[in-house]
Swiss-Prot record:
Main subcellular location: nucleus
Presence of keyword Acetylation: yes
Biased composition (Basic residues): 664-688
UniProt KW keywords: Acetylation, Coiled coil, Nucleus, Phosphoprotein, Repeat, WD repeat
Subcellular location: Nucleus, Nucleolus
Gene3D superfamilies noted in UniProt: YVTN repeat-like/Quinoprotein amine dehydrogenase
Protein name as it appears in the record: Nucleolar protein 10
N-acetylmethionine found at: M1
Ranges of biased composition (kind: Acidic residues): 546-557
Biased composition range(s): Basic and acidic residues: 570-584, 648-663
Ranges for the WD repeats: 50-90, 174-213, 228-266, 270-308, 310-349
Modification Phosphoserine, positions: S25, S475, S514
Length: 688
């Protein structure tokens, strides 16, 4: 057993426990249960609740007594009696089952849809009848009032098979190329089918006419969803008379009210996997939606996640046991999953003891019985010299190797290599020495802000300590230990923005200066070494070489700066193009603002000035108006006050008119008359 908790909701996995190897005999299994406490405490809720390889579908009968599951290989169906907690019967089939439906309250009437177009009917005694449909089927539903089976599949038609008459009826012609899923509302009998184009078509079985179409593909696309292909309908489920849940192939679940063509809620699984099944839990108003990776339980009104269930293997089908907190899963593994969530509801009547056992479950996962065995390959047997044991009871063939007892493996390992302990001891000593060495050179904990700058300063400090010219190099205080620069490594406001334009343009210069400083330190060290060796003249580079080297460095730095500037210009162009595209896509709409009564709107620029003016007292505002000349207050002989104010607009017009008048006068003064210039008389005949 395993206990997990998500959002403070405990989930008990009843199928996760010690798994016994298949090649163990019954006698050894019983002996192992007596010896091993973990195996003895293992809870096997239903005996042999598994398939040989894979389980594809799982359902519960209406009376809740029988659990039916189909799987492979070979294709088969298994029926489990919950009252006996064991397997009731098993029937092998000719081909794999796509889906099946239990028509009766118990297991006496079952219909199977196979992947080779066959429809198989089973009764309580076994196989009853088999027929075929024209196209490959994917899903079917049973209409109880008319005894009709509706089959959908790789065709635009919905085939109808009447079980009372025993013959096919006229099919329903849909507008889709193919249909994936279908369902019938148990309240009013509405038939719905999900198409490959992402639409849901609803039909009235009484008149065999289409009564509505929902375009779910368009409604499933939200701002947060990333969809690369057209969503198709992969799951469909009715709840009551008016609610319907639709699952898409891109991982969205849409909740609809049949009276509206817009979804009430769109829930995204965020995995991009097709929704396998959808179920409703009415007591807590939850929706259980499952894809091949996870089962999510969320509130159908708000979409808030309640809890989730993520098994080890991929999911093929999910079944919610009615009126309880038990969930059954069909997985891509031999074991079928049984999960119990006490918050969803009580344990079923046939396993009411789970309520007491769940209080004693351990939260740590259990180890498997395979820990008592060691898996070895044929090459390992050759190295150990145990090839002669192949075929004996000491080795059990499994996949590409063998299982052998772990105690036997340790004994043989010790005999083959008696010095293994000494080698192990030496390896441990070497690891300890390496750990101590690593601790000596371990750097101090870097600050939260400007980590790269701090690491650079630490490296420079280490280089100074390693250099032999400690006396000649002037010792500078360390910035990391200086309190004046303490804020630079603590306050996020002082974080160096490496993406800024200033940093990218100055970074080549800073790196070039640091490289020059390192070269100078190396040259000084070489000169010191030469002096210590008492050489007459230290060899060095000629001045021409140094000048050429400095010029090359300068050229490299200039090229680096030009490169950074080109990159910045390119990024700026890309940003402008993106902004232009966004501006073209956005549609500008006029915005309206309500102006208070008694106020006059001039421009948005005066809003700040007006706000400051309103904050002042009445006396200050009167003084300000009198100063500008727009307001004058005088006393009358009667003792009252006379107030005169001038409109700003008329005042501005007067000023403008006076300015124009002065301008005309200046132009008139500067104008020179041309009346003194007269044209000379022309010679020759006048031109007529």
């Amino acid at each position: 057993m395993q206990v997990s908790s998500l959002n403070e909701v405990k989930i008990y996995s009843l199928s996760c426990g010690k798994s016994l190897p298949e090649w163990l005999s019954d006698r050894k299994k019983r002996a192992l249960q007596k010896k091993d406490v973990d195996v003895r405490r293992r809870i096997e809720l239903i005996q042999d609740f598994e398939m040989p390889t894979v389980c594809t579908t799982i359902k519960v009968s209406k009376d809740g007594q029988y659990i039916l599951a189909t799987g492979t290989y070979k294709p088969r169906v298994r029926c489990y009696d919950t009252y006996q907690l064991s397997l009731k019967f098993e029937r092998c089939l000719d081909s794999e089952v796509v889906t099946f439906e239990i028509l009766s309250d118990d297991y006496s009437k079952i219909v199977f849809l196979h992947n080779d177009r066959y429809i198989e009917f089973h009764s309580q005694s076994g196989f009853y009848y088999k027929t075929r449909i024209p196209k490959f089927g994917r899903d079917f539903s049973y209409h109880y009032p008319s005894c009709d089976l509706y089959f959908v599949g790789a065709s635009s038609e919905v085939y109808r098979l009447n079980l009372e008459q025993g013959r096919y009826l006229n099919p329903l012609q849909t507008d889709a190329a193919e249909n994936n899923v279908c369902d019938i509302n148990t309240v009013h009998g509405l038939f719905a089918t999900g198409t490959i184009e992402g639409r849901v078509e609803c039909w009235d079985p009484r008149v065999r006419k289409r009564v509505g179409v929902l375009d779910c593909a368009l409604n499933s696309v939200t701002a947060d969803s990333e969809i690369n292909s057209l969503p198709t309908i992969s799951a469909l489920k009715f709840n009551g008379a008016l609610s319907m849940a639709v699952g898409t192939s891109t991982g969205q679940v849409l909740l609809y009210d049949l009276r509206s063509d817009k979804p009430l809620l769109v829930k995204d699984h965020q995995y991009g996997l097709p929704i396998k099944s959808v179920h409703f839990q009415d007591s807590l108003d939850l929706v259980l939606s499952a894809d091949s990776r996870i089962v999510k339980m969320w509130n159908k009104d708000s979409g808030k996640i309640f809890t989730s269930l993520e098994p080890e293997h991929d999911l093929n089908d999910v079944c919610l046991y009615p009126s309880s907190g038990m969930i059954l899963t069909a997985n891509e593994s031999p074991k079928m999953g049984i999960y119990y969530i006490p918050v969803l509801g009580p344990a079923p009547r046939w396993c009411s003891f789970l309520d007491n056992l769940t209080e004693e479950l351990e939260e740590n996962p259990e180890s498997t019985v395979y820990d008592d065995y060691k898996f070895v390959t044929k090459k390992d047997l050759e190295n150990l010299g145990l090839t002669h044991l192949i075929g004996s009871p000491f080795l059990r063939a499994y996949m590409h190797g063998f299982f052998m007892d772990i105690r036997l493996y340790h004994k043989v390992k010790l005999m083959v290599n008696p010095f293994a302990y000494e080698e192990y001891r030496k390896d441990k000593i070497r690891q300890k020495i390496e750990e101590t060495r690593a601790q000596r050179v371990q750097l101090k904990k870097l600050p939260k802000v400007n980590k790269e700058l701090a690491l650079k300063l630490i490296e420079e400090e280490e280089e100074k300590q390693k250099s032999t010219l400690k006396k000649k190099v002037k010792s500078l205080p360390n910035i990391l230990t200086d309190d004046r620069f303490k804020v630079m490594f603590e306050n996020p406001d002082f974080q160096v923005d490496e993406d800024s334009e200033e940093f990218r343009l100055l970074n080549p210069l800073v790196s070039r200066i640091s490289e020059k400083r390192k070269k100078q330190l190396r040259l000084l060290e070489q000169q010191e070494q030469l002096k210590n060796e008492e050489e007459e003249e230290p060899e060095g580079k000629p001045s021409d070489a140094e000048s050429s080297e400095s010029s090359d460095d300068e050229k490299d730095w200039v090229e680096e700066v030009r490169k950074q500037r080109r990159l910045l210009q390119q990024e700026e162009r890309v940003k402008r193009q993106e902004q232009l595209k966004e501006d073209q896509q956005t549609v500008l709409k006029p915005q309206f603002y309500e102006i208070k009564a008694g106020e006059e709107f001039r421009s948005f620029k005066e809003s700040a000035t007006k706000q400051k003016l309103m904050n002042k007292t009445l006396e200050d505002r009167l003084k300000l108006e009198a100063k500008h000349g727009t307001l004058s207050v005088s006393d009358t002989t009667v003792g009252s006050k006379q107030l005169t104010f001038t409109l700003k607009r008329s005042e501005q017009q007067k000023k403008q008119q006076e300015a124009e008048k002065l301008h005309r006068q200046e132009r008139k003064k500067l104008r020179r008359s041309a009346s003194h210039l007269r044209s000379r008389p022309r010679r020759g005949r006048p031109f007529h």
